[in-house]
Amino acid sequence: MNSISTSSKKEIYALVDKVVNKYLQKAKNSPTVNSGNPFVMAIFQDFDPILHRIHGAKTSLGSEMEKIAEIIAKDAWGKHNVRRKININIKLPENVFRTVDNIINNLSNAKKLSNYSEEKKKILEACKNPSKEMESHTYEFDMELYDEANNHWYYLEMKGPDPNTTEVPGAKKRLMVEMAWAFFKNNYKNVDSLFAIYYNNKYPKPYKNPKVLYYFDPDGGLLVHDLFWNFIGKNNSTYTELLNIFKEYGKKNKKRIWDGFSKLIVKT
């Protein structure tokens, strides 16, 4: 049985089509627009406009992956158990925030590698022994999932394979704070926070981006490539199904895409 429903497949197809059409239209309206990089242009001269548009389309598709994850998750977890882009004002004891900051500082200073189980235990202990002083901060979270069958909550941050240096510790803090908030404010017993990388750009080699692995434990709290998509879809075939949707789109629209982009090649 497929994990991605027919209706969800159509939604994903429409998102991809929207991005492709956007860049085909840009190619038609502004065929001479280039990267603006004189060094790249000097090397690739005749091909820079097409490379520029393809790079833009790739970036825009990356921005749609969170929406695609939400579509798939609603199939697997139920619409009422999925929330995305949530803004929450979180009020926690001061010692909980200090615990989170200490964990991040130790990782930032490379004093130790991330150990998800140990970090989770420290946060839970801080919540069980709260200080009187409270702090309040507002955060935006990428996704919240609730597993009704097991009464288990999951909080996720989702990035591409090479997030910038400031994004990773920021995501780490948000995930730990949200997990603490779930323990302390809502008294949830089963909670996990997960950092998701939606594809491994070195596949089939292991994912080894040091910017990420300094802060996230591959043995807990980190989902990469097929592990992420299969988790979201609650099915070991989800990643393959999703990839096949993209392949099918590419095959059906190959001529249209080539006709639109090939006109950007400057013939000299």
List each language-model region with its residue ranges.
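Active-site metal-binding core of divalent-cation-utilizing nuclease and nuclease-like domains
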Residues: 85-149
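A short acidic (Asp/Glu
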Residues: 95-96, 167-169, 203-208
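Non-catalytic C-terminal interaction segments of nucleic acid-processing enzymes
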Residues: 3-23, 203-268
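Surface-exposed cleft-lining segments at the edges of enzyme active sites
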Residues: 54-56, 126-132, 158-166
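Mg2+/Mn2+-dependent nuclease catalytic core
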Residues: 160-183
